[in-house]
Amino acid sequence: MLLTPPRECGGCAAKADPSLVAHVVRHARVGQRPANELIGLREADDAAVQRMCDDVALVTTVDGFPPPIEDPSDYGAIAAANAVADVYAMGAEVQTALCFLAFPRETDPAYLGAIMRSAAQVVADCGGAVVGGHTVHSAAGVFSLSVTGLVHPDRVWAATGAQPGDALVLSKPLGTGLAISAHQPGSFESAIAIMRETVQAAATDLHTMRRAPSAVTDVSGYGLLGHLKEMTRAGGIAMCIDASSVPVAPGARRLASIGVRTGAHETNLEYVRKSLTGQPSDDDLAILLDPQTSGGLLAAVAPDEIPDSFVRIGTVVAATDNESTLVVST
């Protein structure tokens, strides 16, 4: 038996909606904030960061999802690439990973082995190692990884901190969620290749910049607009996006034009609706709200220093009010 992929809500399209996540997180805020905590629940960033000593901070994160595809090697590799992205988004280097694998009793052991083998290879390629994990029998299949990284405490990146005048840049095309949902030849294979690629090289490019990025995150289940909204949490800024400049995966625009949507489309739209201004078309919204599994890095950088592995998609401006923080032009 193989794990059946729920394509319309597999991968990061299965991510719980932001209001539910906020509710759950509120109940986890127990006790005092640790003295060495740099980033934690209150910041709601891509990973937690704790200062271990003057020169070292520990980055920890966990991520996983139901299978978006049938091939176990692709599933494991994509899940690992997706999980390490959170470490890279904090400016850290991957160290170790723990794996959690839930599966029905009838699942072929060879299938499970292929998931683990490909995931472990991705972690190793990033300079880390899978050092343990846990397995349980479950009615539904889920694979996730908890990844640790190390970074200097003074060089941690965060999702907030973008400044007016910064350029908004993206390292991967959007639309893989649409391609997985449609499962059409050509676009499907292209999406697999995009999702298997880690953001390690993109993070390295950001590290080589003369001026550190003002803000960095990765595009995941809430789509580009959802993660841009999260970058505005500190207030005072708005994100102006040129929809025509956004890189799109092969075939994704055609899929959007024929009405393909993922299971996360409506919840992602609801999340950003009050913040959104401009006149994006329905097809543009399908791309901009598309949940990404192993999506690219999204960064706010100096406009005169855009790394080669990134595409400029917009500009950070001063906010004119507290609500209209996402401006989309076409």
Please annotate each region the language model reported.
Residues 1-89, 163-168, 310-315:
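N-terminal glycine-rich phosphate/pyrophosphate-binding loops that anchor nucleotide-derived ligands
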Residues 48-59, 199-203, 269-279:
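Acidic-glycine-rich active-site phosphate/pyrophosphate-binding loop
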Residues 37-39, 47-50, 85-88, 120, ...:
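A generic local secondary-structure boundary/capping motif
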Residues 8-9, 38-40, 74, 89, ...:
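Short glycine/serine/threonine-biased micro-segments
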Residues 146-155, 187-209:
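Active-site glycine-rich loop that binds ribose-phosphate moieties when present
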Residues 52-60, 64-69, 74-77, 93-183, ...:
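Glycine-rich anion-binding loops of enzyme active sites
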Residues 72-96, 114-125, 198-212, 222-230:
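Small-aliphatic-rich amphipathic alpha-helix that forms the alpha element of a beta-alpha
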Residues 1-9, 18-23, 35, 105-129, ...:
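Glycine-/charge-enriched secondary-structure boundary and capping motifs
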